[in-house]
């Protein structure tokens, strides 16, 4: 049985200078997504996607590495300045922002958009270890 020819799409270089870096920092992982101003994703990375497993995913170093890889691929599209939105209480919040700056992106604004309930759902019971 012959295999069909699969046409691979080449990633088109977009010329976008301003963008938004969404950092989702949970207690277990850190996900960094870099989008344009309209929310279309340019690049993304996470601690788990880089090969960190288990409790190593929730370290500030893993968040730093995820942020660096996402920013490098976004800078290939011509990204220069970025607004940062941070969501979640995890340990990788600050280190992910610092990694964006050290990678060469200019951070213009930092916004905390962590969802806070106005006494909505009942939280899960406390862990007893």
Swiss-Prot record:
Keywords: Ribonucleoprotein, Ribosomal protein, RNA-binding, rRNA-binding. GO terms for biological process: translation. GO terms for cellular component: ribonucleoprotein complex; ribosome. SUPFAM superfamilies: Translational machinery components. GO terms for molecular function: rRNA binding; structural constituent of ribosome. InterPro entries: Ribosomal_uS11, Ribosomal_uS11_bac-type, Ribosomal_uS11_CS, Ribosomal_uS11_sf. Located on the platform of the 30S subunit, it bridges several disparate RNA helices of the 16S rRNA. Forms part of the Shine-Dalgarno cleft in the 70S ribosome. Part of the 30S ribosomal subunit. Interacts with proteins S7 and S18. Binds to IF-3. Belongs to the universal ribosomal protein uS11 family. This is Small ribosomal subunit protein uS11. The lineage of its organism: Bacteria, Bacillati, Bacillota, Bacilli, Bacillales.
């Amino acid at each position: 049985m012959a295999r069909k020819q699969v046409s691979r799409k080449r990633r088109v270089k977009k010329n976008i200078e301003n963008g938004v870096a969404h950092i989702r920092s949970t207690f277990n992982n850190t996900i960094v997504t870099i989008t344009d101003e309209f929310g279309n994703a340019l690049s993304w990375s996470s601690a788990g996607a880089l090969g960190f497993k288990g409790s190593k995913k929730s370290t500030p170093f893993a968040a730093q590495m995820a942020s660096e890889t996402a920013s490098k691929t976004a800078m290939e599209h011509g990204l220069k300045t970025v607004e940062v939105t941070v969501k979640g209480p995890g340990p990788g919040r600050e280190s992910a922002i610092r990694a964006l700056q050290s990678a060469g992106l200019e951070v213009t604004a930092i916004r905390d958009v962590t969802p806070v309930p106005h006494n909505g759902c009942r939280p899960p019971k406390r862990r007893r270890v």
